Amino acid sequence: MTFDFELVGKIGSMALIDRKAGIIDYTRVARLSRELRPGYIWVSSGATEIGRLDYMQRTGREIAGEHAKTDYAAQGQGILMQTYRQFVDPAYSVRQVLVEHQHFNDDQKSEHLKGLLLRCREQNAIPIVNYNDAVSSEENRRMELLALSHDRKRVFECVDNDETASRIACLVRARTLLIFTSVDGIYLNPDDETTLVQTIGGKDAYELTENIEEHKKYCIGASRAGANGARAKLEFVKDAAAQGTTIYIANAKYSIAEVLSDSVPCTKIGVEL
């Protein structure tokens, strides 16, 4: 298979924030940012939580009400991009790409997004992708997805950036999909670190999909409220794995290079592993 991109990577909010200090983990962001290069697509959560922390530091209080998430996202997205720009190699451009579910449920919008991402690679730019929470209404989104479900066999929500990254990996035919999280990967028993699943493989796409489904049975819970957890990650990556993309689910304390060189503990998913 021919791949258009070397890597689609994703990092979650939990991995970006220094919880004790209540700020961005600048050491981690700097380390990861310096590894980004053209041919990589970086899907980054964190805008909402960064916006919340920034608002609290400036005002001493939190925002109340149903619009808090969108307000925080609007405040945090600029800070998130500024932080990446600060640490990415200055020889490379950094481009903000905000998406919603329509970009994966409408063929014309999908092609437009794909063209943008391909041009980033050609123009020495690194796209930083996030879901556009600032302008996304939960009620409207649900109505739109319901309407789409009448016309399409599959509908992609993509509110979870694990799904966003997986859909992008399919869209651009990525060689590797790397999902950074706050644990080392998928566990047979999430309470026992010795049960880390190192590989999920198969001789072909069909067998691989069956093995992914089997491992979903062991996945319960999530690392934070509102997250979908390991089970959802495995569900989201099935299509990418079936098309030939190699998936890593790894701890964000490691570098991209360490994970891709198979030198640190993680879960690796792919055909004929």
Where are these regions (language model features)?
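C-terminal catalytic "cap/lid" subdomain
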Residues: 1-273
